[in-house]
Amino acid sequence: PASITKILTCIVALEMVDDLDKQVTITDSDVETVWETGASAANFTPGEVVTYRDVFMGAMLPSGADACRALANNTCGSQEKFVDKMNDLVKKLGLKDSHFVNTTGIHDPNHYTTAYDMAKITQYALQNEKFVEIFTRYQYNASNGLHQWVKKVLYTCKRDHMNVSMIEGCKSGYTSDAQHTLSSMINVNNHHYICVVGYSKNKDGYNHCTVNDTITLGNYVGSHYKEVNLLQSGNEVTKSSVSDGEKNKVAIKIDQDINIVLPNDYNEKDIEYKQKVKTFTAPVKKDQHAGKLDVYYKENKLGSYTLSTVNNVAESESVIMFRKIKNILIPCVITVFICIVVLLIVRQFILKRRRRRRRRR
């Protein structure tokens, strides 16, 4: 994966850092081996005081291996413990074709992933607002005024007059074994996609290979896929059973529009809806949560949507009458029972007194 590894590094660290403005001090351990391995650096120096935000930006924009090492050392105390957390997240996401041995992406036979797995890691990371801020940043000035970074992969493209507006956020990487890699969030027709390019090469006049490949893929999606409205918010999709109600069914509706991106030549027969709907006991309130609707296209799950009830369902008259009778009878029964118990106690007391009198005679 090369330096797109740093997407995983950043999200693992972000989940352990509450305050991005908290200051940390760069140590010798943070910068050691960086130059020897030929890794990219944010050019931090031992003793330098920076914020966590600076360190995250240093990992993402100039692809600083020193920044990644600083994140690991400050959050876990060592590179090894941090890498364990990286692999723990990989397992949590159910990714079976990935394993990481360092925080930077320096080549190692046991450090590997796939485009699919990297897309899932990026998708997970983009659920974190702080990560989105870092991932989509184009330029950044460090808080101590000592560093200014730019996202080089996009900067060089803009310098050569390429239109890269489709790419809203990205992380690039390169090693001789992985070649050029890029994991991006792209915007195509106002829809966001994650695009991962690996083993891309600049050759025969084909420059900015990963960006060109990403734009090519984005343009393909834009010309071969379209947004389809399958259901509108409020559409009735099914009915559910109601016990003890004036009606034995309640209508169930979808809570939001279902807009799905599908191939231009999609077949409606390939779309499948799977409902998980609750049953109810009256009274039922309007807009009460009723379950979920999963949408599949060719057996691939595209989304899960909440369901709710269309209307109120009151209790049946017989249930109401039974409750009234129960509310009257139960206190009466309890009162009678208490009276019987009291009478039995009194009777027992009287009998005992009579026995004592007889004995005295």
Q: What do the PLM-derived regions correspond to, one by one?
A:
Residues P1-Y116, K120-E129:
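Active-site-adjacent loops and short helices of periplasmic peptidoglycan-processing enzymes
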Residues L95-K96, H107-R355:
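Domain-terminus/edge residues, biased toward the C-terminal soluble/receptor-binding domains
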Residues R357-R361:
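Short, charged juxtamembrane terminal tails flanking transmembrane helices
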